[in-house]
Amino acid sequence: MTNKSSLSYKDAGVDIDAGNALVDRIKSVVKETRRPEVMGGLGGFGALCAIPTKYREPILVSGTDGVGTKLRLAMDLNRHDDIGIDLVAMCVNDLIVQGAEPLFFLDYYATGKLDVDTAARVVTGIAEGCKQSGCALVGGETAEMPGMYHGNDYDIAGFCVGVVEKSQIIDGSKVKAGDALIALASSGPHSNGYSLIRKILEVSGACAETTPLGDTSLADKLLAPTRIYVKSLLSLIENVDIHAVAHITGGGFWENIPRVLPENTQARINSQSWQWPEVFNWLQQAGNVSTHEMYRTFNCGVGLLIAVSQADVEKTLSHLNACGEKAWLIGDIAPQAAGDAQVIIN
């Protein structure tokens, strides 16, 4: 040994005690998400989960996502409570479009210096998202990495696994000309297009917190948590033969709808069937954004699109409305003529 002072992990910027304090803070909210299939508790090297016994030929479906630069806006405005809901929503909504019931969720939280209060607020939001979607928060990773992030900045990612009966997978193969398209309303921009949103705020000089929009502020509209459609869709699947579901995320209408359409089919969207929520009108006007670019970047008030047969339209609308969703007939499926796009917005 020399006379040099002894270094610790904390001296290097990693506070193990803070990490342990975070685990203690979140234990109770994580426990509230537990499903009967989950074996063991927090703290193991891996999480164990059985497949529900009701499935005869279960197929596992997995997904991972983040919340993009919506997180930057949330950090700038010190609003950390709902961003965890966004994280879960982006993952579980991708699973439900294939008919999968979310089983469990894991999160990754990375930061340069762990702020226990902020992290606890984020994880509490993640737990709330898990409760809304019926999946268990079975674990995660909190990485304190000095020098990797500026100040108290952090990043989050989510990972979800679900299950679907093989015979009930929704993959778009049933879609045919004549099918109806049903829209489910979004809660706002959800978690996509925020780099453009932040650029619009910068160019317009608008302060999100003090700019009024309807009965609240622009900030409230922009940071409204992403709507989770899982329970409504799982219920609908039991009652209606769903041909396809598209999650309107990054890439908007033009990119996401074709992902679930068979070749030689075309989605025809009636733009007169709904009014854009005021936040999208504000963004278009403040940023002088073309209508084509709006549909390419944002959901414009449509979180999901569902394809069903014309005979099931009224049943679908009635069921979704009973589940608390705002749903309407937005268009139909037609044969795709040579040279035409797969999505037409009239």
Swiss-Prot record:
Pfam families: AIRS, AIRS_C. GO terms for cellular component: cytosol. GO terms for biological process: 'de novo' IMP biosynthetic process; adenine biosynthetic process. Pathway: Purine metabolism; IMP biosynthesis via de novo pathway; 5-amino-1-(5-phospho-D-ribosyl)imidazole from N(2)-formyl-N(1)-(5-phospho-D-ribosyl)glycinamide: step 2/2. It catalyses: 2-formamido-N(1)-(5-O-phospho-beta-D-ribosyl)acetamidine + ATP = 5-amino-1-(5-phospho-beta-D-ribosyl)imidazole + ADP + phosphate + H(+). InterPro entries: PurM-like_C_dom, PurM-like_C_sf, PurM-like_N, PurM-like_N_sf, PurM_cligase. CDD domains: PurM (cd02196). The keyword Transferase does not apply. Signal peptide: none annotated. It is found in: Cytoplasm. The keyword Acetylation does not apply. Keywords: ATP-binding, Cytoplasm, Ligase, Nucleotide-binding, Purine biosynthesis. It comes from the Bacteria. It is an enzyme of class 6 (ligase). GO terms for molecular function: ATP binding; phosphoribosylamine-glycine ligase activity; phosphoribosylformylglycinamidine cyclo-ligase activity. Its EC number is 6.3.3.1. Belongs to the AIR synthase family. NCBIfam families: purM. This is Phosphoribosylformylglycinamidine cyclo-ligase. It comes from Proteus mirabilis (strain HI4320).
